[in-house]
Curated annotation (Swiss-Prot):
Gene3D superfamilies: Nucleoid-associated protein YbaB-like domain
HAMAP family given in the database record: DNA_YbaB_EbfC
Subunit structure: Homodimer.
Name of this chain's protein: Nucleoid-associated protein Pfl01_1806
This protein's record includes keyword Membrane: no
Organism of origin: Pseudomonas fluorescens (strain Pf0-1)
Keywords: Cytoplasm, DNA-binding
Length: 112
C-alpha cells in the first residue's frame, strides 16, 4: 500500500509539473500592451519581457518624418530589451552564487 501511495504521489507531481510547464509557456507567449500619455506612446511586450513594438504618435516627435520616427521607435524597443537582458543576467548571477552550494536537481530553477 505504501508503494502504491508513493507511486500515485509521484504521478501527481509529474502531472503538476507538466501543467506548470504548459502554463509557463502560455504566459511567456502572451502579449500585453502598455500605453502612456493618453495613448500617445504604446508598447507591446511578451510574457518573456521582450518588447515587440513601440509606437509613438507623430505629434510627440513633430520634427521627424515617418521613417525617422520608426527608427526612434526601434531604438527605444532595442534599449528596453537590452536593459531587460541585463537584469536577467544580473539575477541569474546572483541566484547562481546563492545556490552554488545546494545540490539542486538538474533543471530546477530558482525562484520557482
Amino acid at each position: 500500500m505504501m508503494k502504491g501511495g508513493m507511486a500515485g504521489l509521484m504521478k501527481q507531481a509529474q502531472q503538476m509539473q507538466e501543467k506548470m510547464a504548459k502554463m509557463q509557456e502560455e504566459l511567456a507567449n502572451a502579449e500585453v500592451t502598455g500605453k502612456a500619455g493618453g495613448d500617445l506612446v504604446t508598447v507591446v511586450m511578451t510574457g518573456r519581457h521582450d518588447v515587440k513594438k513601440v509606437s509613438i504618435d507623430p505629434s510627440v516627435l513633430p520634427g521627424l518624418d515617418e521613417d525617422d520616427r520608426e527608427v526612434v521607435e526601434d531604438l527605444v524597443a532595442a534599449a528596453v530589451n537590452a536593459a531587460v537582458r541585463q537584469i536577467e543576467a544580473n539575477s541569474q548571477a546572483k541566484m547562481g552564487s546563492m545556490t552554488a552550494g545546494m545540490n539542486l536537481p538538474a533543471g530546477m530553477k530558482l525562484p520557482f
